[in-house]
Amino acid sequence: MKILWTLVILVSFTVSSISKDNLSETDVAEPQEAPSVEDVLKEANKSFAYKGKAIHPGCVEQFMVNLADSPPPIVRAVDVESCVSSNEFFMDYKVSEDGYIGYEYEDSGEKNYFGYKVIGKVKGGIHILDTRASGGGTMVAMTVFLARFGLENYRSFDQQEKLTIEQRLIMKCIGQIDRGDRDIGSLELINNNLVLGESQYRKKVEVINLD
């Protein structure tokens, strides 16, 4: 009887050891390091994304100019992390069949929409974004934004007035082209030239050099 109990204990100990070994190898994930600010900047420049997700269209919408005003926009720089993690842009976005990353929201009881499509990137790290916005009526305002990413220092003080300096990813609007209401013309980026096709606003193709 003692021999039998000894065998049972040995078998139980062996199974327990094997289970722990397997758990340590397969089920216990190694903690992942947070990406450096340099990696974050690299991803933004490569994919117009932040930590694996497309930048929320609400962040790009900050560059919009009120119809009653003229450019440049009041807001020309956006802290990307603060924007994508804010309560203001908690809602999901969707990608339309024609490639626009957009979202819908209500403002003063009216349904609004804003979306952007990355046309490409030119020299100097300038991203070309074709955008469309609507709200409350039939107008669909179409605007091309020129955006560029960079790192900037942000200084903050705690309750003991200790200074902390943190590098942040900043998206800046460095230019824009108004296309008008529901422009039907094509939009292409050829080398460093932005080519706007014929439309109800243009009788011939227009080429804008972005060098």
Task: Give residue spans per PLM region.
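Acidic, small-residue rich beta-repeat scaffolds with periodic aromatic anchors
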Residues: 20-86, 152, 165-211
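Structural motif
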Residues: 137-146, 202-209
